């Protein structure tokens, strides 16, 4: 994750702002600079290479002292920065909005995936600039639309029916901020269209998940799509979701946290997010992840979770 101010800076033109991507030499200069505490939140002028990000964001970049940041000297960093600028420049951002826009925290990996989709000549985003910009605006929180299959970050499609598409995420192969844990495996499920879904399509998805992905929990971060994650990583996801939710609501911003379809979501996660929305503490909410919750009556007749050991999926082993 990183703030948009880590990728670009605003330049006032008439009554609105144009956004310009940083170059990596300017960032490198900022990372070596000694800056007064009172100037930590200001864009840094490298003199030679142009404007650089505010020094307060130093930890967002990979250095010899910090291996967890972005690999800003890669070609991919420039591709993502340009993509963000193209999307922001399609809007009219005024002085009253610019600080809020640049402080927004976005998923670096999501944006790299969109950059990869843009370069794939078989992908619809390669052929449609309008759809590409729409996808980026959704990714950076400048659109209220949800991420559907056409505007999704992408990955490897492992399941699809008339209503849903399931993607295996490819973060291990990334340049900008790769996942270093070689055991990482995670999926995302997007809606093909943001409209009511038939019970038949839901049943098909639930059957696929219970049969092929029974070692995973189906959760949501509240943004209109599902995530399919290892049970061992659920607590980590819970911490992140709770922190994000509290941070947004603390600042007085309304958040439409979408609980999604209870028939698909892991029931303990549904209980966790419902409790979170009611205003309970993290400890109270997280206890629900580890409690045995009484199984709801199976909404799909004939669909069982009972499997013999030789029938259990080996995905995720």
Swiss-Prot record:
Question: What are the names of the required cofactors?
Answer: Mg(2+)
Give the function comment from the record.
Participates in replication and packaging of the viral genome. Plays a crucial role, together with NSP5, in the formation of virus factories (viroplasms), which are large inclusions in the host cytoplasm where replication intermediates are assembled and viral RNA replication takes place. Displays ssRNA binding, NTPase, RNA triphosphatase (RTPase) and ATP-independent helix-unwinding activities. The unwinding activity may prepare and organize plus-strand RNAs for packaging and replication by removing interfering secondary structures.
**Name of the protein described by the UniProt record:** Non-structural protein 2
Cite the residue spans of the region called RNA-binding.
205-241
Where does it live in the cell? Answer: Host cytoplasm
Any idea which GO molecular function terms this record carries?
A: ATP binding; metal ion binding; nucleoside diphosphate kinase activity; ribonucleoside triphosphate phosphatase activity; RNA binding
Residue spans making up a coiled coil are none
One biological process term in Gene Ontology = viral genome replication
Quick one: where is this thing mainly located? host cell
Q: Which UniProt keywords apply?
A: ATP-binding, Host cytoplasm, Hydrolase, Magnesium, Metal-binding, Nucleotide-binding, RNA-binding
Family annotation (InterPro entries): Rota_NS35_C (IPR048306), Rota_NS35_N (IPR048573), Rotavirus_NSP2 (IPR003668), Rotavirus_NSP2_C (IPR024076), Rotavirus_NSP2_N (IPR024068)
Q: How does it assemble?
A: Homooctamer. Interacts with VP1; this interaction is weak. Interacts with NSP5; this interaction leads to up-regulation of NSP5 phosphorylation and formation of viral factories. Interacts with host DCP1A, DCP1B, DDX6, EDC4 and EIF2S1/eIF2-alpha; these interactions are probably part of the sequestration of some host SGs and PBs proteins in viral factories.
Q: Where does ATP bind?
A: 107-109, 188, 221-223, 227
Keyword Transport among UniProt keywords: no
Task: Provide one Gene Ontology cellular component.
Answer: host cell cytoplasm
- For this protein, the Enzyme Commission number is 3.6.4.-
Which Pfam families does the annotation name? Rota_NS35_C (PF02509), Rota_NS35_N (PF21067)
Identify the catalytic residues. 225 (for ntpase and rtpase activities)
From what organism does this protein derive? Rotavirus A (isolate RVA/Human/United States/WI61/1983/G9P1A[8]) (RV-A)
Q: Superkingdom of the source?
A: Viruses
What family does the database annotate?
A: Belongs to the rotavirus NSP2 family.
